[in-house]
Amino acid sequence: MAELKENTVQHTLCMPLCGRMIAARKCPDLFPDRDAERIVRELGEDISGKAMYRLQYMWMNCLIRQYNLAWEITEYLKRHPKATVVELGAGLSCLRRQMSNETNSRYCLDMENVIALREKHIPLGEHEQNIVCDLNDFSWFDKISFDPAKGIVFTAGGLFYYFETE
């Protein structure tokens, strides 16, 4: 039985995850991802041929977003090698593992039910911390430890769709 309910905000976590899985299957040298397929299977998602490929172009767009975020973080870290990395709405992102980055402090912020999934399916890195929060309540910023002289970089992939405009 699937761990995520169909047609829910939480189920949208599968979009970038499935994109990463498809890319790792088709082009493992270009898009290495040792986590995506394992997590999809653990979540109990249907990855049969028809279910998997009917939305593959949408998933590929999510994949491209993920790798663009990795590229931007990498470029920032070249200029600020000791910077803190913060993923707002981290979902089931495995950017740290994809980037093979175990040296920078990293914070993954998301809702309680999502952080519970992260903690079940994605092992924490040595300098990584999951933070349960409501991103509309900026008190989460107090939970992030960083040195302004070293820098900080934020990502927010696929997140803004869920915010309401005022």
Question: How would you label these PLM feature ranges?
Answer:
Residues 150-166:
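A short SAM/SAH-binding and catalytic strip from SAM-dependent methyltransferases
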Residues 1-86, 90-133, 148:
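Rossmann-like AdoMet
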Residues 139-149:
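Short amphipathic alpha-helix with an adjacent loop that forms part of the alpha/beta core around
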Residues 130, 138-141, 162-166:
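A short, conserved alpha-helix within the catalytic core of class I
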